[in-house]
Amino acid sequence: MSTETLTLIKNSIKSIPDYPKAGIMFRDVTSLMEDPKAYQATIQSLVEKYKQGGFTKIVGTEARGFLFGAPLALELGVGFVPVRKPGKLPRPTIAQTYDLEYGTDTLEIHTDAIVEGDKVLVVDDLLATGGTIEATVKLIRQLGGEVEHAAFVINLPEIGGETRLEGLGLNVYSICEFAGH
């Protein structure tokens, strides 16, 4: 990816101070999607990175993972699988609970969405703690999928999610990084 493309993408992401609470600098990818050139450059950079990966499925985690994972899946000519919060998927599912800063949350995937031997790429908008993606990876592996790669638009390296995911055997890629929380 060229420096010009990276600058376009990074500059299109708005930073919102003290959201959702004081001391947090929220990185808003919806502003990136409002700019068609930046959005297209983001998807194309992921296509270039993963077009030779041999993936059979792209999995996106609710909700912003859908916005990058689905167009990537179309470009790669593979299926897209959403991982959602409980009660949002109509067919039989399996669930994985994970820890949040204050409490827990749960994610679900259709039991027939991943088959034994599927080579899966996980996509989300932002990597912070890695908890959501860890739960997603556990769901995929429980269904027999092979997942060794996770891609993000943004990484917040100071929070430690990349190290956490590498501990699960994942190769982690992010288009850009921002300092802080």
Swiss-Prot record:
Lineage summary = Bacteria, Pseudomonadati, Pseudomonadota, Gammaproteobacteria, Vibrionales
Keywords, comma-separated and alphabetical: Cytoplasm, Glycosyltransferase, Purine salvage, Transferase
Which reactions appear under catalytic activity for this entry? AMP + diphosphate = 5-phospho-alpha-D-ribose 1-diphosphate + adenine
Q: Which GO terms describe its molecular function?
A: adenine binding; adenine phosphoribosyltransferase activity; AMP binding
Superkingdom of this protein's organism: Bacteria
EC number per UniProt:
2.4.2.7
Which processes are annotated in GO (biological process)?
adenine salvage; AMP salvage; purine ribonucleoside salvage
Pfam entry (one): Pribosyltran
**Top EC group:** transferase
Q: Does the keyword Glycosyltransferase apply?
A: yes
- State whether it acts alone or in a complex, and with which partners, per the record: Homodimer.
Give the family per the record. Answer: Belongs to the purine/pyrimidine phosphoribosyltransferase family.
What biological function has been recorded for the protein in this entry? Answer: Catalyzes a salvage reaction resulting in the formation of AMP, that is energically less costly than de novo synthesis.
What subcellular locations does the record give? Cytoplasm
- State the species of origin: Aliivibrio fischeri (strain ATCC 700601 / ES114) (Vibrio fischeri)
Output the InterPro entries linked to this UniProt entry.
Ade_phspho_trans, PRibTrfase_dom, PRTase-like, UPRTase/APRTase
Q: What is its main location?
A: cytoplasm
Record's Gene Ontology CC terms? cytoplasm
Gene that codes for this?
A: apt
Which sequence ranges form a coiled-coil region, renumbered to this chain?
A: none
State the pathway, as annotated in the record: Purine metabolism; AMP biosynthesis via salvage pathway; AMP from adenine: step 1/1
- Designated name of the protein: Adenine phosphoribosyltransferase
